[in-house]
Curated annotation (Swiss-Prot):
This is Kappa-type opioid receptor. Belongs to the G-protein coupled receptor 1 family. The chain crosses the membrane at residues 58-85, 96-119, 133-154, 174-196, 223-247, 275-296, 312-333. One of its GO terms (molecular function) is receptor serine/threonine kinase binding. Keywords: Behavior, Cell membrane, Disulfide bond, G-protein coupled receptor, Glycoprotein, Lipoprotein, Membrane, Palmitate, Receptor, Transducer, Transmembrane, Transmembrane helix. Its main location: membrane. The gene is Oprk1.
């Protein structure tokens, strides 16, 4: 998919939003509406499509959405990372994976201002180096996020279905090692994005695009190959693993009443499993539309109507919105995160509440608070 500054040749359109450059064909999320010529080059001068008339309000709306994603996502994910580092009780295996997910989401939210500028200016004005960095962050986010969610699901499966093995496998240290391996694995794609990414002047429309640069004579081949690889390795296989893990967990949860030795541990186990399931489900809901859209476009089955293009932009925005949703989910679904968030945001209020609770506990903790002296109970 070309990363055209214009979705259709002949009329200005949104440029390749580099942080949307998650799927290749010069690795833009924007589909290659311009057809390739016989040599594989994209958008030849003799093959032009009628432009779709996109409302000027669409870039403004997208910019507003990305602004919210930027603020909520960056602040929220930074807060998640802070409380995991700050509070010892939060350094569990599951939370180590959550830290990794928050790091990837926080990084990708930093690209939102650049995306917004590209939508509004219809060109990439930030230079070649920043273009490479932004594209690389996109790829890192895409692969580290889905790989981390997959490992979180495997971690939950082991905790629920193999509690004895979980004692050795589910440790914070091993979770950290797995996170490092995830980033190293994602680097095979992220570093490639740095090498291939760059700016290109589109003289026919007088704009600059930021995208992966493939040889023109092999463009169509690389386009299809990269799209299929991304779809299979960054979506289909991880989602299938997640589905298998949660299917086995559901069967296990239905077959036994008590998973661990105590009801409190069992309740915590089910609560954390539910949290991970919701986070995974929201991720899949947010990213499935754009993956399907890209796959359909790669097969040449999309029309070039205004409605289709508008839907495409909505799918892109929905995918990036996921980066700001996870901190909200933690705050509502996990009591430990909720308590730590409140402790950070309202330290004085929380300190006063703890002092009040401690005073109440001290007054009722010992029923023998009266000492019998001379046949009479007197306060000590």
């Amino acid at each position: 998919m070309e990363s055209p500054i214009q979705i259709f040749r002949g009329e200005p359109g949104p440029t390749c939003a580099p942080s949307a450059c998650l799927l290749p064909n010069s690795s833009s999320w924007f589909p290659n509406w311009a057809e390739s010529d016989s040599n594989g080059s994209v958008g030849s001068e003799d093959q032009q499509l009628e432009p779709a008339h996109i409302s000027p309000a669409i870039p403004v709306i997208i910019t507003a959405v990305y602004s919210v994603v930027f603020v909520v996502g960056l602040v929220g994910n930074s807060l998640v990372m802070f409380v995991i580092i700050r509070y010892t009780k939060m350094k569990t295996a599951t939370n180590i994976y959550i830290f990794n997910l928050a790091l990837a989401d926080a990084l990708v939210t930093t690209t939102m201002p650049f995306q917004s500028a590209v939508y509004l200016m219809n060109s990439w004005p930030f230079g070649d180096v920043l273009c490479k960095i932004v594209i690389s962050i996109d790829y890192y986010n895409m692969f580290t996020s889905i790989f981390t969610l997959t490992m979180m699901s495997v971690d939950r499966y082991i905790a629920v279905c193999h509690p004895v093995k979980a004692l050795d496998f589910r440790t914070p240290l091993k979770a950290k090692i797995i996170n490092i391996c995830i980033w190293l694995l994602a680097s095979s794609v992220g570093i490639s994005a740095i090498v291939l990414g760059g700016t290109k002047v589109r003289e026919d429309v007088d704009v600059i695009e930021c995208s992966l640069q493939f040889p023109d004579d092999e463009y169509s081949w690389w386009d299809l190959f990269m799209k299929i690889c991304v779809f299979v390795f960054a979506f289909v296989i991880p989602v299938l693993i997640i589905i298998v893990c949660y299917t086995l967990m559901i069967l296990r949860l239905k077959s036994v009443r008590l998973l661990s030795g105590s009801r409190e541990k069992d309740r915590n186990l089910r609560r954390i499993t539910k949290l991970v399931l919701v986070v995974v489900a929201v991720f899949i809901i947010c990213w499935t539309p754009i993956h399907i859209f890209i796959l359909v476009e790669a097969l040449g089955s999309t029309s070039h109507s205004t409605a289709v293009l508008s839907s495409y932009y909505f799918c892109i925005a929905l995918g990036y919105t996921n980066s700001s949703l996870n901190p909200v989910l933690y705050a509502f679904l996990d009591e430990n995160f909720k308590r730590c968030f409140r402790d950070f945001c309202f330290p004085i209020k929380m300190r006063m509440e703890r002092q009040s609770t401690n005073r109440v506990r001290n007054t009722v903790q010992d029923p023998a608070s009266m000492r019998d002296v001379g046949g009479m109970n007197k306060p000590v």
